[in-house]
From Swiss-Prot:
UniProt keyword list: Metal-binding
Record-linked PROSITE patterns: VOC
Protein known as: Uncharacterized protein YwkD
Domain spans labelled VOC: 5-128
MF GO annotations: metal ion binding
Organism ancestry: Bacteria, Bacillati, Bacillota, Bacilli, Bacillales
Organism the protein comes from: Bacillus subtilis (strain 168)
Encoding gene, per UniProt annotation: ywkD
Coiled-coil spans in chain: none
Tagged with keyword Metal-binding: yes
PANTHER family: FOSFOMYCIN RESISTANCE PROTEIN FOSX, LYASE, PUTATIVE-RELATED-RELATED
Residues at which a divalent metal cation binds: H8, E56, H77, E124
Length: 128
């Protein structure tokens, strides 16, 4: 099997409108398609970043809360590259999004920081 790339990442949110606004209006994802699935009472929102299909945002009635801690087994976080970490952090702060202090990766020497989506999913900004 030869894997070519990651096709998408699926995220289940607890408040669809809040998460949609966060990813679209605060982080700048573009809406590819929004579908209401009546049989499930839920939405599926396909989002792209710079023209590449990246995230499926799902809403389900009463989803259970996220149970994992950042260091638990399984998916830990999603990381996005940025040109200027200082500028990206400033933009997040201007939009009311708090970030952790900027740190330096001891293995690569690159700077990074974390912030959280409305459901406390850890998101990382990693400077190129």
């Amino acid at each position: 099997m030869l894997l070519k790339s990651i096709h998408h990442i699926a995220i289940i949110c607890s408040d669809y409108e809040k998460s949609k606004a966060f990813y679209v209006h605060k982080l700048g994802f573009q809406v590819i398609q929004e579908t209401y699935r009546e049989e499930r009472g839920s939405y599926k929102l396909d989002l792209s970043l710079n023209g590449s299909y990246v995230i499926e945002l799902f809403s389900f009635p009463d989803p259970p809360e996220r149970q994992t801690r950042p260091e638990a087994a399984g998916l830990r976080h999603l990381a996005f590259t940025v040109g200027s970490l200082d500028k990206a952090v400033q933009e997040l702060h201007e939009k009311g999004i708090e970030t952790e202090p900027i740190r330096t990766d001891p293995l690569t020497g690159k700077r990074f920081t974390f912030f959280f989506d409305p459901d406390q999913l850890p998101l990382e900004l990693y400077e190129q």
